[in-house]
């Protein structure tokens, strides 16, 4: 559901980006411009002109790292919740599937409410909170106004000094560049692949769709804007690939360790052999004492 909700969001952003124009002074007003575009303009001017002495490429890279560090606590929390939910669902799935069948067969509203209440009890039993998965959208929602502000700053050439010092590496930051655009698209595809490895099987199809949609959107928007936006996305995607890879390794081990008590409890409750084995062990220990 979370991934599906992002599709209309991206579509709305594309329409918004296509319709706004801040290229002339008389148009540079309004809530969005004053809240997001103007601060981004001043920040880039300060980093590019004063801190890095007319190197706006380095200014954009530092800006990416700064934004990513702000988002890091939200991202780590999202990784942890995702891994915990997936591991706990492996244990709770038989019970959840049984209750969901009850919901489908329910003929009255009272029966549905009773089944849903039973489902909530199962979630509580395994310390699961499905609402936490909704927080996965939070880093995207926080970052979107920042990216959109940067988009208009670069598209409408609002940063003083950038036109005089536009070069970074092999490309001109004020013009589209096919290679940095392709790099951004490829890196976002890799990031989607890395993220999809931890998705539950039922969510894989939507994950594969995002693998295609995200790079296409990145490439399309980057070709409409200057290569500075492609640089922003390339550095951001590279950071995400590294962050996601190591977070998946760490939180996968942590989730399996924390879920182990639930697995052992489930096996004791649902595996008669383990109960008999436990009783036999107690009998043997008593005989040994005698």
Curated annotation (Swiss-Prot):
Residues 270-290 are annotated as: Disordered. Residues 280-290 have a biased composition (Polar residues). A lipid is attached at residue 20 (S-diacylglycerol cysteine). PROSITE patterns: PROKAR_LIPOPROTEIN. Residues 1-19 form the signal peptide. InterPro entries: YidC/ALB3/OXA1/COX18 (IPR001708), YidC/Oxa/ALB_C (IPR028055), YidC/YidC1/YidC2_Firmicutes (IPR023060), YidC_ALB_C (IPR047196). Its main location: membrane. The chain crosses the membrane at residues 56-76, 134-154, 176-196, 211-231, 232-252. It holds the Pfam family 60KD_IMP. GO terms for cellular component: plasma membrane. A lipid is attached at residue 20 (N-palmitoyl cysteine). One of its GO terms (molecular function) is membrane insertase activity. It is found in: Cell membrane. It is a multi-pass membrane protein. One of its GO terms (biological process) is protein insertion into membrane. Belongs to the OXA1/ALB3/YidC family. Type 2 subfamily. Required for the insertion and/or proper folding and/or complex formation of integral membrane proteins into the membrane. Involved in integration of membrane proteins that insert both dependently and independently of the Sec translocase complex, as well as at least some lipoproteins. NCBIfam families: yidC_oxa1_cterm. This is Membrane protein insertase YidC 1.
């Amino acid at each position: 559901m979370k991934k599906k909700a992002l599709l209309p969001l991206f579509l709305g952003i594309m329409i918004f980006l296509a319709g706004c124009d801040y290229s002339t002074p008389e148009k540079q007003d309004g809530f969005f411009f004053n809240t997001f575009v103007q601060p981004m303009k001043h920040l880039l001017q300060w980093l590019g002109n004063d801190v890095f002495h007319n190197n706006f490429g380095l200014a954009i890279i530092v800006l990416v790292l700064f934004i990513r560090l702000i988002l890091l606590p939200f991202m780590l929390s999202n990784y942890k919740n995702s891994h915990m939910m997936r591991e706990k669902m492996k244990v709770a799935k038989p019970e959840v599937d049984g209750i969901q069948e009850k919901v489908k067969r329910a003929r009255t509203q009272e029966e549905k409410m009773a089944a849903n209440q039973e489902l909530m009890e199962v979630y509580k039993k395994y310390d699961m909170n499905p609402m936490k998965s909704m927080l996965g959208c939070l880093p995207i929602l926080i970052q979107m106004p920042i990216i959109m502000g940067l988009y208009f700053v670069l598209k409408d050439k609002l940063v003083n000094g950038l036109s005089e010092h536009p070069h970074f590496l092999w490309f001109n930051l004020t013009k589209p560049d096919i290679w940095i655009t392709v790099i951004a698209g490829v890196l976002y595809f890799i990031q989607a692949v890395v993220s999809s490895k931890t998705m539950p099987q039922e969510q894989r199809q939507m994950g594969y769709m995002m693998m295609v949609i995200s790079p296409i959107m990145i490439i399309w928007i980057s070709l409409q804007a200057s290569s500075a936006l492609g640089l922003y996305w390339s550095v951001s995607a590279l950071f995400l690939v590294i962050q996601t890879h190591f977070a998946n390794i760490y939180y996968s081990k942590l989730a399996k360790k924390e879920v182990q008590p639930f697995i052992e409890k489930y096996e004791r409750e649902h595996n008669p052999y383990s109960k008999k084995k436990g009783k036999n062990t107690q009998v043997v220990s008593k005989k040994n004492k005698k």
